[in-house]
């Protein structure tokens, strides 16, 4: 079978050249070492079995003799770095700068020396200095012993201390200030992962509002029930939500993130993102899925190196006549290495025919230097060592061990050789954002068609459809998958491999980076109000107002004159609103109408002392402008249906915690703003379905508003009230403002009438008949106050 190669053209995404990309990540993609010292992380440890490892090493280090600093590029490039280098080479970005921590332990006096050495090594890297206290509290404490464990569902190991959080805030502020110091108006800021969740919000306080800020979340995002455990959960969400775009590895993580934001911050959730109201303005954060990839070309070139080919041949001689299973994991709890070893032991117990014919190469890379491990890591390391020794003692011989255990960081070239050799890759983390080892294995298996066994809890399981997917908690499933892979026909191996290979080839790190950056650029330009409807032109409205002799205002109440609140009774008018309405009514050329879904008693209580016109319950009752004007009732206000509808709504109120039923003189409304967001939305759909059966018997309208379902007599709506009023007034200035679907009836009534119609914010996915938009009720007050002073 021929493997079909598919190329992905980045130019098909967006042809526009982007500005400089400022990447902010906890770690720089380089290894920095003080002369004659080892780095905090990254130095190779000795191999446990020299028979199958060789030292290709990393790139030749750069050493500053005066500063005694040694710097070298990591042998295995980060996907983000690969993406930036490729995009720069293709002239698709102006340049790039990476801001991060070197993991090199220096004192404050040596910091200038370190910064200078890094600048001389490459202009693409900018160092953020962490002192030992920050390293302990921010990195080892809050990030690794708190956030990282929670994001990966490791609840038994989580620890939290207040000083850890304080240091986390401080380090995030350091990163924000460093970014702000190098930022220029055309730059695009790209922040990475859970270490820096507060940085976007901090940057909003340091940079102009038009700054383009994107955030990519590499780790899994947990369910709401887990995330809510964090003491500072709201601060973290608010921090990251100041981004224009947030990217995740899979839709599952987007769903969890939306759920946490809706429940903890009471935010409006849309299919494409989240709507945030803060300080009188609105911001929209787009959420999208961007599965990360690997640099295919880099791996392909590496496979053709003479030393890699030579190493593959030597390994084949060592393991001649044997099937090879490879696994590469970090020294941490989420990788599930002890369970894999238990599976392998059970396999050899149950199937002795594989003894001597099957070898398991377990690469176990340390994530910290010896002595810096946590107690859990030390126990884990000891457990794995003991298990490997026991299994090899049980099933091995002098000339052969069933498990080859490599407990060190190995070179890029050595990895490539092992990946190319292996017949099976066993990748079974308990939880992982993506796990690019799977992609790397697929690239290296271009000619061998090895089988990939993959945990269903790795993000890669949603991308690599040719894999055998297993539950990493089921030893039986894993063992059956290994046996299936060992006995798979070449035809099936090729079919499965081609599915994976085509995906990896099409979804490279460059494609991932380009997609994210182009979407970020677009999201920044558009924001929530950058739709087909332009922003309302206040100057044009004011100019028309000044020229007019007869002016009419049609104003919604909730969400328009006042901000939306959790309880209807809390939506009392502000003093500023009362003052503005009073000023407008002092001019005899003005007639002001508040047209609301509110009940009559509330409007009378809050606004009844003003000489304004009012219509309540969406047009059921109307009062003309002036003092002591009587209310008139619509002739269509029949209420025979009311008991039936009330009974249904009260039943849903009983079955939906946090919801409430509001009974007006005619209309009835079921509110679910205080209910669980997902369950409330589900119940709202169910309620509408039941109410439609009632509407078949009675002439009723069912209105779906913002977190509310209202039932009213048919033929009564805000648009009909507007038409009725305009029949009596020959106005040469009309201003109509509303914020939800019920106000669309007013906009429709005025669509062919010379007028100014404005929608306050609204649903991104919802079209409007309004001719302009504003972001919030505070902007409405600004406009009305401006007109009252004209």
From Swiss-Prot:
Q: State the EC number(s).
A: 2.4.1.15
GO biological process terms held by the UniProt record: trehalose biosynthetic process
Task: Please give the Pfam families that the UniProt record associates with this protein.
Answer: Glyco_transf_20, Trehalose_PPase
What InterPro entries does this protein's entry cite? Glyco_trans_20, HAD-like_sf, HAD-SF_hydro_IIB, HAD_sf, Trehalose_PPase
Keywords assigned by UniProt? Carbohydrate metabolism, Glycosyltransferase, Transferase
Q: Which domain of life is it from?
A: Eukaryota
Family assignment? In the N-terminal section; belongs to the glycosyltransferase 20 family.
* Protein name in the entry: Alpha,alpha-trehalose-phosphate synthase [UDP-forming] B
Organism source for this protein?
Answer: Dictyostelium discoideum (Social amoeba)
């Amino acid at each position: 079978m021929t493997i079909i190669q598919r190329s992905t053209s980045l130019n098909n995404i967006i042809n526009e050249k982007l500005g400089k990309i400022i990447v902010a990540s906890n770690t720089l993609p380089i290894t920095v070492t003080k002369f004659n010292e080892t780095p905090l992380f990254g130095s190779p440890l000795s191999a446990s079995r020299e028979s199958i490892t060789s030292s290709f090493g990393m790139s030749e280090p750069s050493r500053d003799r005066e500063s005694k600093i040694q710097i070298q590029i990591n042998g295995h490039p980060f996907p983000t770095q690969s993406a930036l280098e490729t995009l720069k080479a293709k002239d698709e970005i102006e340049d790039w700068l990476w801001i991060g921590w070197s993991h090199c332990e220096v004192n404050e006096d040596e910091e200038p020396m370190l910064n200078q050495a890094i600048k001389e090594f490459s202009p693409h890297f900018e160092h953020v200095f962490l002192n030992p206290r920050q390293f302990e509290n921010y990195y080892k404490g809050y990030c690794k012993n708190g956030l990282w464990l929670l994001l990966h569902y490791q609840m038994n190991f989580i620890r939290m201390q207040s000083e850890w959080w304080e240091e986390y805030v401080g380090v995030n502020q350091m990163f924000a200030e460093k970014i702000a110091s190098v930022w220029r108006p055309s730059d695009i800021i790209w922040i990475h992962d859970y270490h820096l969740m507060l940085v976007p919000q901090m940057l909003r306080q340091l940079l102009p509002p038009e700054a383009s800020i994107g955030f990519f979340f590499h780790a899994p995002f947990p369910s709401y029930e887990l995330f809510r455990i964090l003491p500072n959960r709201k601060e973290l969400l608010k921090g990251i939500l100041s981004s224009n775009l947030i990217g995740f590895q899979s839709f599952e993580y987007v769903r969890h993130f939306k759920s946490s934001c809706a429940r903890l911050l009471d935010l409006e959730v849309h299919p494409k993102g989240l709507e945030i109201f803060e300080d009188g303005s609105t911001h929209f954060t787009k959420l999208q899925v961007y599965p990360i990839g690997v640099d295919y070309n880099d791996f392909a070139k590496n496979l053709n190196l003479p030393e890699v080919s030579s190493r593959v041949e030597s390994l084949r001689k060592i393991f001649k006549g044997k099937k090879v299973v490879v696994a590469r994991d970090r020294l941490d709890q989420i990788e599930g290495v002890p369970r894999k070893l238990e599976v392998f032991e059970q396999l050899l117990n149950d199937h002795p025919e594989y003894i001597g014919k099957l070898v398991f190469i377990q690469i176990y890379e340390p994530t910290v230097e010896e002595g810096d491990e946590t107690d859990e890591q030390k126990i884990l390391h000891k457990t794995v060592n003991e298990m490997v020794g026991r299994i090899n003692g049980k099933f091995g011989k002098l000339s052969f061990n069933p498990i080859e255990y490599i407990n060190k960081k190995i070179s890029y070239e050595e990895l490539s050789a092992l990946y190319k050799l292996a017949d099976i890759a066993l990748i079974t983390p308990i939880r992982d954002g993506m796990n690019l080892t799977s992609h790397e294995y697929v690239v290296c298996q271009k000619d061998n068609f090895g089988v990939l066994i993959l945990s269903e809890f790795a993000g890669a399981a949603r991308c690599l459809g040719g894999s055998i997917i297993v539950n990493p908690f089921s030893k039986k499933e894993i063992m059956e998958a290994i046996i299936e892979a060992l006995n798979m026909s070449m035809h099936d191996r090729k079919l499965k491999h081609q599915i994976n290979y085509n995906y990896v080839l099409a979804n490279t790190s460059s494609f991932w980076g380009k997609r994210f950056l182009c979407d970020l650029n677009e999201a920044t330009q558009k924001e929530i109000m950058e739709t087909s409807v332009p922003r309302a032109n206040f100057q044009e409205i004011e100019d028309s107002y000044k020229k007019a002799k007869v002016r009419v205002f049609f104003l919604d109440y909730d969400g328009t004159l006042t901000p939306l609140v959790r309880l209807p009774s809390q939506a009392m008018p502000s003093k500023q609103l009362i003052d503005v309405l009073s000023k407008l009514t002092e001019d005899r050329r003005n007639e002001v109408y508040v047209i609301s879904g509110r009940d009559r008693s509330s409007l009378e209580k809050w606004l009844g002392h003003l000489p304004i016109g009012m219509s309540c319950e969406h047009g059921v009752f109307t009062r003309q402008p002036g003092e002591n004007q009587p209310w008139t009732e619509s002739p269509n206000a029949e209420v025979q249906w009311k008991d039936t509808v009330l009974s249904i709504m009260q039943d849903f109120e009983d079955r939906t915690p946090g919801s409430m039923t509001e009974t007006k003189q005619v209309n009835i409304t079921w509110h679910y703003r205080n209910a669980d967001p997902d369950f409330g939305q589900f119940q709202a759909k169910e309620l509408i379905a039941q109410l439609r059966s009632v509407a078949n018997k009675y002439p009723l309208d069912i209105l779906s508003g913002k977190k509310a379902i209202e039932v009213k007599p048919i033929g009564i709506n805000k648009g009909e009230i507007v038409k009725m009023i305009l029949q009596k007034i020959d106005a040469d200035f009309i201003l109509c403002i509303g914020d939800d679907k019920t106000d669309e009836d007013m906009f429709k009534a005025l669509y062919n009438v010379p007028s100014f119609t404005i929608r306050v914010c609204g649903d991104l996915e919802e079209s409007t008949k309004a001719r302009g938009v504003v972001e919030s009720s505070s902007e409405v007050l600004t406009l009305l106050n401006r007109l009252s002073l004209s």
